[in-house]
C-alpha cells in the first residue's frame, strides 16, 4: 500500500496522502488547507504534531527524515503540556514556590507555574487580582531572564515600582527613547521608590526591560532574540493584526522561550481578536487565520476583521482545557470584592447641539448608505459621522453630567468620571468651576504627560481633587483609586464593552472596601441609543470566551456588524428620511 508523507514548509506541516487516507485526514483536521487532491497544510504546532502522531498509528504516513527530530520534539512538548495542565486539577497539587520580597498568593503561584510549564499563557484573571505580581513570579525561575515587559505608556513607571517591591534585586530599565541605544550608556535615572535622581551606568543588558507599545516597533531588531521572556501587559492592545505594535510583538514573541499575556478583557469588540492575542502568546496554537475562521467563526461571518465566534463558550472552554488561558474570578481566588451595581440613567441632552451637526451628518450618512464616492471617501465619511455624533451627544449631555456628579460629590462621594472628547472634559470642568461651591477636579486624559497623569492620580488619591476626569481609554492598568472611590460615572460611551469593564475595574478591584456604583448616563437622542445596542452584541462575544461556564454565557447574536452604518441609518430615520434595508 502506498504511504503518505509528512514534511514541514514555512512553519506548516505539509501532508501528502492517498485518497482513502485523505478522507480520514480531512475528518480529523477540518481546518486543514487543501492545496490539491491529496495534499494538505496544517500549522506546525505541538498539538497538530501530537494528533498527526496518533493518526500515523492507524494510517500509513511517513515522516521526512529531515524533520524527524523536530516532529518528535513538538510531540514531546505537547505531552509535557498536557501533563502540566492535568497536574493542576489533581488533589494535592502544590504550585512551585517563588522567592519574592512579598510572598505571592497561591492562585498567583498556580498561574505562574502553569506559564513556566507551557511556555505561553494568557492570564485573564478578574480586574484587580494582581496579574503583574503573577508575571513577576516567573522572573525568579531559572533561565527566564532577561525579560521584556511591554505595557501602556502611563504604566511603565508603575511596573518598575512593582518589580522593585516584589523583586528588588532585579535590575530594571525603562526605554526612554523610540530610537534604539546601547544599554551601557551613561544616563540619569530617577529611583522609582525614593524619587531621587542619580547618574548610573548600566552593566549591559538589564534583567528586565520595560517598553511601551508605541516604542516596540522601533526596538524590535534590538530586542528580538535578545530576551528570553516577554510579558504583554494589557494584551488587548494587540487585538489588531495590521498594526506595527502587533507585528513587532509577534516577531519578538516567536524568539522567546516564555510568553505571558495579561488582560482581563482580551476581546474589546469581535471574537476574531482572541486569535491575534493568542498568536503572540502561543504562536500558531489556534491554527492559521483561515483555520480559525473556518472552524470557530463558521461560514456566514461577513468581514473577516469583524468575524464573530459562533460559540464563544465552546472556545473559552477549549482555551482553558488546552492550557492556553487561565481565568479566575473573585470567587475563585477567595478574595471577596464588594457588590457592583450598574445603573443606566437617562439624562437630558441639549438637542440644539445635535441640530448644529444634523445637516452635515445627514449628507455624510447618505454617502455611506448609498455608497457615494470612493471607498476612501466613504471611510472618511463614516469616521466623521462617528466623531461628530458622539461629540455632539457628549457636549449635549455635559451640563446634565456635571449636575449629576455635583450631587454625588455633595453627598460625600469622590467620583471617577469617564469621557472621550476634550470638549466634554472642558465643559464639565467649567461647570464645576461655575457652581456655587467649586468642585476641585483633576484631569487624566490623552493630553497629559505621564508625569502629569501621575500628579493627577496623586491629587485624587490624597483628596485634593474630588473628581477625576479620565479618558475612556487611558485608565487601563491604573491602580490605587479603589482605596478612595467607589463611584464611577460614564459621561460618554465607547463602542467596546471591554473598555467599560476596564474603567469600572479601576475601583471595583482588590482593596475596595465598599459596594461600587457605576452610572451610565445615556441620552435618548444622538449616538447613545445605537452604541448601547451594539455594545450588547459585542459583550456576547467577550463574555462567552471569558466565562464559558457562567449561567448567562451567551451565543453570539446574529445582528449586523457595521456600527457606523447603523448610526447613519438612525440619523436619517430621525430626520424623516426613507432608508432601504
Regions found by a protein language model. Give the residues of each.
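Conserved Walker A/P-loop ATP-binding site and its immediately adjacent core
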Residues: 134, 144-165, 268-273, 420-422
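Conserved helicase ATPase core of P-loop NTP-dependent helicases/translocases
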Residues: 182-184, 416-418, 426, 433, ...
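Charged, low-complexity
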Residues: 13-121, 165, 170, 191, ...
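Interdomain linker/hinge connecting the two RecA-like lobes of the SF2 helicase core
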Residues: 119-122, 235, 241-242, 270-271, ...
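A conserved SF2-helicase RecA2
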Residues: 495-580
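SF2 helicase motor core recognition
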Residues: 216-221, 267-271, 425-429, 453-457, ...
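Walker A/P-loop
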Residues: 118-138
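Conserved P-loop NTPase motor "coupling/switch" region that bridges the ATPase
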Residues: 144-147, 165, 169-172, 180, ...
Amino acid at each position: 500500500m502506498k504511504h503518505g508523507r509528512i514534511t514541514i514548509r514555512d512553519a506548516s506541516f505539509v501532508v501528502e496522502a492517498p485518497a482513502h487516507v485523505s478522507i480520514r485526514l480531512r475528518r480529523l483536521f477540518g481546518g486543514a488547507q487543501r492545496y490539491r487532491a491529496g495534499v494538505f497544510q496544517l500549522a506546525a504546532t505541538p498539538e497538530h504534531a501530537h494528533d498527526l502522531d496518533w493518526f500515523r498509528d492507524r494510517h500509513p504516513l511517513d515522516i521526512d527524515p529531515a524533520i524527524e527530530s523536530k516532529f518528535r520534539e513538538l510531540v514531546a512538548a505537547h505531552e509535557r503540556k498536557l501533563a502540566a495542565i492535568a497536574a493542576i486539577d489533581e488533589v494535592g497539587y502544590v504550585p512551585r514556590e517563588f522567592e519574592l520580597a512579598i510572598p505571592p498568593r497561591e492562585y498567583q503561584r498556580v498561574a505562574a507555574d502553569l506559564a513556566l510549564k507551557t511556555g505561553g499563557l494568557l492570564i485573564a484573571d478578574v480586574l484587580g487580582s494582581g496579574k503583574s505580581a503573577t508575571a513577576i513570579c516567573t522572573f525568579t525561575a531559572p533561565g527566564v531572564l532577561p525579560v521584556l515587559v511591554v505595557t501602556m505608556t502611563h504604566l511603565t513607571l508603575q511596573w518598575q515600582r512593582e518589580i522593585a517591591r516584589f523583586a528588588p534585586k532585579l535590575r530594571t530599565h525603562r526605554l526612554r527613547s523610540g530610537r534604539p541605544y546601547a544599554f551601557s550608556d551613561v544616563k540619569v535615572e530617577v529611583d522609582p521608590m525614593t524619587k531621587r535622581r542619580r547618574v548610573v551606568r548600566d552593566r549591559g543588558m538589564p534583567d528586565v526591560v520595560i517598553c511601551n507599545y508605541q516604542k516596540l516597533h522601533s526596538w524590535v531588531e534590538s530586542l528580538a532574540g535578545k530576551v528570553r521572556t516577554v510579558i504583554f501587559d494589557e494584551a488587548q492592545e494587540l487585538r489588531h493584526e495590521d498594526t506595527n505594535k502587533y507585528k513587532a510583538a509577534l516577531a519578538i514573541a516567536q524568539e522567546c522561550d516564555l510568553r505571558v499575556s495579561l488582560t482581563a478583557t482580551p476581546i474589546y469588540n469581535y471574537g476574531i481578536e482572541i486569535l491575534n492575542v493568542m498568536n503572540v502568546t502561543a504562536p500558531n496554537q489556534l491554527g492559521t487565520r483561515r483555520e480559525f475562521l473556518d472552524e470557530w467563526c463558521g461560514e456566514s461571518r461577513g468581514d473577516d476583521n469583524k468575524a464573530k465566534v459562533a460559540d464563544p463558550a465552546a472556545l473559552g472552554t477549549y482555551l482553558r482545557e488546552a492550557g492556553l488561558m487561565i481565568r479566575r474570578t473573585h470567587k475563585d481566588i477567595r478574595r471577596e470584592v464588594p457588590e457592583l451595581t450598574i445603573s443606566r440613567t437617562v439624562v437630558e441632552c441639549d438637542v440644539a447641539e445635535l441640530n448644529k451637526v444634523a445637516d452635515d451628518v445627514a449628507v455624510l450618512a447618505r454617502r455611506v448608505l448609498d455608497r457615494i464616492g470612493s471607498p476612501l471617501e466613504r471611510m472618511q465619511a463614516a469616521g466623521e459621522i462617528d466623531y461628530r455624533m458622539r461629540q455632539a451627544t457628549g457636549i449635549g449631555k455635559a451640563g446634565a453630567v456635571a449636575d449629576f456628579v455635583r450631587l454625588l460629590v455633595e453627598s460625600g462621594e469622590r467620583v471617577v468620571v469617564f469621557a472621550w472628547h476634550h470638549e466634554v472634559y472642558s465643559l464639565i470642568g467649567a461647570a464645576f468651576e461655575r457652581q456655587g461651591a467649586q468642585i476641585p477636579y483633576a484631569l487624566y486624559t490623552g493630553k497629559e504627560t505621564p508625569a502629569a497623569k501621575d500628579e493627577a492620580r496623586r491629587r485624587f488619591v490624597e483628596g485634593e481633587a474630588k473628581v477625576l476626569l479620565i479618558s475612556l481609554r487611558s485608565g487601563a492598568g491604573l491602580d490605587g483609586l479603589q482605596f478612595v472611590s467607589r463611584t464611577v460615572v460614564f459621561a460618554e460611551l465607547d463602542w467596546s464593552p471591554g473598555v467599560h469593564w476596564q474603567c469600572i475595574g479601576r475601583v471595583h478591584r482588590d482593596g475596595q472596601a465598599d459596594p461600587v456604583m457605576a452610572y451610565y448616563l445615556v441620552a435618548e437622542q444622538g449616538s447613545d441609543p445605537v452604541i448601547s445596542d451594539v455594545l450588547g452584541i459585542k459583550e456576547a462575544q467577550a463574555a462567552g470566551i471569558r466565562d464559558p461556564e457562567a449561567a448567562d454565557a451567551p451565543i453570539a447574536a446574529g445582528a449586523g456588524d457595521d456600527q457606523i452604518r447603523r448610526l447613519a441609518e438612525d440619523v436619517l430615520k430621525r430626520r424623516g428620511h426613507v432608508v432601504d434595508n
